[in-house]
Amino acid sequence: MSRDFAALRGSQQGPVLLLASGPSAGELCLDAWRDVPVITMNGAIAKLANSAIEPLFYVCSDLSFALQQPELYALGLERARHLALWPEAIEGLSERLRGKAHTLRRAPSTRLEHYLGVEREQAQRARALLSRRARDIGFSRDMDYGIFDVRTVAYIALQLAYHLGFTEIYLAGVDLNAQAQRFYEGGTGPRSPCGLDEHLHNRILPGFKVMQDVMTTEGRQVFNLSRSSRIPAQLIPRADLAVVEGAWLGLRTRQAG
């Protein structure tokens, strides 16, 4: 039987790495992150295949991914401590895997009362009363209330990181470049479809703006480790990957000494 997310709400603190599959994720030095919780998604689990890192969560929001990349999907299911999947995906799991699966569900469609504060504890929405396309853009504070999907799985992972309680969030591989291969895709291997260009300006970036408003108001920080990301640095500040990884390695050395 799958679970809800309530028992894990606020269970974490401090830093977390959100590992996506943009090509910049290939630059990560995993040894630097071995003491930092990791939330990974879709095919980005490939980065951890030859490491000892056990991700806290594996998030897969693409119901076709299991057919497109069955080996990577199976790896994510096995390696992660927890899974965040749609109900249809959970139905296809073994009883053992269902025991660590948490059910993704969509937040309620926007109604006028949502702009009047009735869901203040659960979510924040973009103020777009006159735009049908942007009306259901928001950021969930409670995974069991439901998530907002702006057409990139990294955004679901951000809502999960918030729900869990993390306050220092690092984005790796969130390049949002539809023309670039994912770091795990070879030149002749199968490629999963990508609709980033279609949704970047009308859903993805407006969603990240709502997310950043929530995080900033509550004193949480989000950093982008990708130098080639299409998310403007004014929206999510860049962090120098070498500096961040050097800090983690230095901290471990001091603690060991």
What does each model-identified segment do?
Residues 1-257:
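Metal-ion/cofactor- or nucleotide/acyl-coenzyme-handling active-site neighborhoods
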